[in-house]
Amino acid sequence: WHDFYHLPEYVRLCATHEGGVPMAFWAQCRDASFLAPMILRPLPASLNASPDWCDCVSPYGYSTPLVAPTQEQLPAFLEAVVGLAQERNVVAAFFRLHPFWELNKGDLCRFGKMVHHGQTIYLDLSVTQDEFWKQVRRNHKQNYQRLVQDGFEVSIDDWAHLAAFTAIYRDTMQRVGAASCLYSEQYFIDLKSILGSSMHLCCVHSRTGAVVAGGVFVEMGGLVHYHLSATANDCLRFGPNKLLIPAMRAWSQGRMNRVLHLGGGVGGAYDSLFHFKAGFSDAQADFYSYRLIVDQSKYESLSRMAATPAGEEQSISTNFFPAYRRPVPSASQLPPVSVGTTVAHDPGVEA
């Protein structure tokens, strides 16, 4: 089993847009195999580290390490990952784990640290339409009915609307301050080229036919992921995105998928985005990251010497990972974004 986050072409696309070199940790032991797609990053110039030093992060999304056919050899694989990473002067590695692919926590914690970021929301597609609507929050239902009455409609896989979706997507990312996800239309064209018939565009149209909300969904192995979404600034008060989920639930169920995964809040936070998604389903899954310090001495040195505006040493953060990449604002800047937010959009790395 694998998800679209593990496709080599997807990892390369992420590396291009997020910065870094696409690579993967791959190993075999007896009849078992291990794969962890990553993006290798140079360290920030402000650290004055050796040019040979680097770190790595998994590509955007739930690109968890895969091990098959069983996890019996997971400790041996993790030991091999650490050994190879040390040879390549990798200081630290950050992995995003998959909510529906659980790795043995005991084995993981022997080598690194698991961090629970919160819950993700999903829809069990085995339930009937009536059972689904019983779970939907009352104000979501009311808003949905009002949108239908006002003539809003949904289209699925009409790619003539990609440019319009991209425009409102970029406006949305600027509105919420997610500069690292400010993808161009070419990104979506490239993503479609990679994923082919697995990628789907769902758009909400006003009575005039204008695209006022939309989402990119990816279907693979019985899972449908709500990957990226947007709402037009001048239509926020109408909540047109409340039409997306019921439409894609019915569509996904009709194609015999098992789960429609909506994801969680920004960085796993229990924020307004999480609240919106939780209004459609009671079903939740845990979202973890896995943090691996490959070279403790280098990691501590870099974390202590991470530059501050005043040129003073910075204490090692126990939350942000890696600590030496923690944003440090100048006196004239706003406070840094939350740890969860940054982790969610931290570019992935493959090594």
Where are these regions (language model features)?
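A conserved beta-strand-loop-helix scaffold within acyl/acetyltransferase catalytic domains
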Residues: 1-47, 97-237, 350
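Conserved acyl-donor/pantetheine-binding loop and adjacent beta-alpha core of acyl/acetyltransferases
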Residues: 40-62
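Aromatic (often tryptophan-rich) hydrophobic motifs at membrane interfaces
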Residues: 26, 44, 79, 187-303
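Short, high-confidence coil segments that cap the C-terminus of an alpha-helix
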Residues: 20-22, 87-90, 255-257
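A short, internal acetyl-CoA/4′-phosphopantetheine-binding micro-motif in the GNAT/acyltransferase core
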Residues: 60-72, 126-127, 229-238, 266
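Active-site/acyl-donor-binding loops of N-acyltransferases
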Residues: 39-42, 106-131, 255-351
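Aromatic/hydrophobic pocket-lining residues that form the small-molecule binding cavity
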Residues: 74, 78, 140, 245
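A gly/proline- and charged-residue-enriched helix-loop-helix capping module
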Residues: 56-103
